A protein has these predicted regions:
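A Zn2+-metalloprotease active-site environment signal
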Residues: 2-8, 17-252
Length: 252
C-alpha cells in the first residue's frame, strides 16, 4: 500500500516490471517528454488510468463475484462510499498472496487477497481510505506525471491519438505497475493517513483499524535491516499518530 511502503520494504508487494524494449523512434526528447507529462490534464490522467487499470486487470486473477473475497469487499465498499471527490469508484479483488492495495485517478480500486487474509474488515477499510486519499489529494496524478516524464514508460502524446493512443498495452501495464508501486514522501503519506482517518469518521467507521493495520505492519518490520524505504515514516509512529488523534477526539 502506500501504507504500501512498509509492505514493499518487506518484499511482499509485486515487483516492478521494466520496459526495456521500447522503440526509441517513438520518443520525444527528455525535455519535451517532461513538459508533456507535467502538462497532463485531469481528463488525460483518468484516460491513462482507465487503460492502465484494464491492462492490469487482464493480467490478474480477479475474484469471482460470488466469492467470499468479493462479498466481503462489497460490504467494505458500501461502508466507504462510491466516489472519490465525485469520481465514481469501482472495486475488485486480485487473487494473489501479495499484500497490497491501490487506487487510481479513474476510481479503479483493487485490493489483493493477501491483504484481506492479513487484515480484518476495519483495517481493510482504513487501508482503502488511505489509498483513496492519495487520489483525492493529487498524489497519484503527480506520480503519473513523474512516471511519464522520467521513467521508462515515456512516450510522446501525438496530436491525433492523444497520449493514450501513443502507449502500447505493455507500456500501459508498466505505467500501472509504476503507479501501484509508487513511492510517496513522508508528508504525502501522513496526509493520506489523515485523509483516511477523516473519511472513516465521516462514514461513521471507527478509525482504530488504521492504527491496528500499522501495528500489524510494525510487528512484521521488527528486526528488518535498513532499506531504501527508511525515509518513510515508521509504522509504529504512524499508528501512534492515529492513536493520538483518537484520544483527542475521545474515541476508544
Amino acid at each position: 500500500m502506500k501504507i504500501r511502503q512498509a509492505l514493499l520494504a518487506l518484499g511482499v508487494a509485486a515487483a516492478l516490471t521494466g520496459c526495456q524494449n521500447m522503440d526509441s523512434n517513438g520518443l520525444l526528447s527528455s525535455g519535451a517528454e517532461a513538459f508533456q507529462a507535467y502538462s497532463l490534464s485531469d481528463a488525460q490522467v483518468k484516460a491513462l488510468s482507465d487503460e492502465s487499470c484494464k491492462e492490469m486487470d487482464s493480467k490478474a486473477t480477479l475474484a469471482p463475484a460470488n466469492s467470499a473475497y468479493r462479498q466481503r469487499l462489497d460490504k467494505i465498499a458500501s461502508a466507504l462510499g462510491d466516489n472519490i471527490n465525485g469520481q465514481p469508484v469501482n472495486y475488485n479483488v486480485y487473487i494473489t498472496k501479495d499484500v497490497n492495495a491501490f487506487a487510481m485517478a479513474n476510481g479503479c480500486i483493487r485490493v489483493y487477497s493477501g491483504l484481506m487474509d492479513m487484515m480484518n474488515d476495519n483495517e481493510v477499510e482504513a487501508v482503502i481510505g488511505h489509498e483513496m486519499g492519495h487520489v483525492a489529494l493529487g498524489h497519484v496524478k503527480r506520480g503519473m506525471q513523474v512516471a511519464l516524464g522520467t521513467n521508462a514508460v515515456r512516450v510522446a502524446a501525438a496530436s491525433a491519438g492523444g497520449i493514450v493512443g501513443s502507449l502500447s498495452q505493455s507500456q500501459l501495464g508498466d505505467l500501472g505497475e509504476k503507479l501501484v508501486n509508487a513511492q510517496f514522501s513522508q508528508r504525502q503519506e501522513a496526509e493520506a493517513d489523515d485523509y483516511s482517518y477523516d473519511l472513516l469518521r465521516k462514514r461513521g467507521i471507527n478509525p482504530s483499524g488504521l492504527a491496528t493495520s500499522f501495528e500489524k505492519l510494525a510487528q512484521q518490520e521488527a528486526g528488518r535491516q535498513s532499506t531504501m524505504f527508511d525515509d518513510h515514516p515508521a509504522s509504529e509512529a504512524r499508528a501512534q499518530h492515529i492513536r493520538d488523534r483518537m484520544a483527542a477526539d475521545g474515541i476508544n
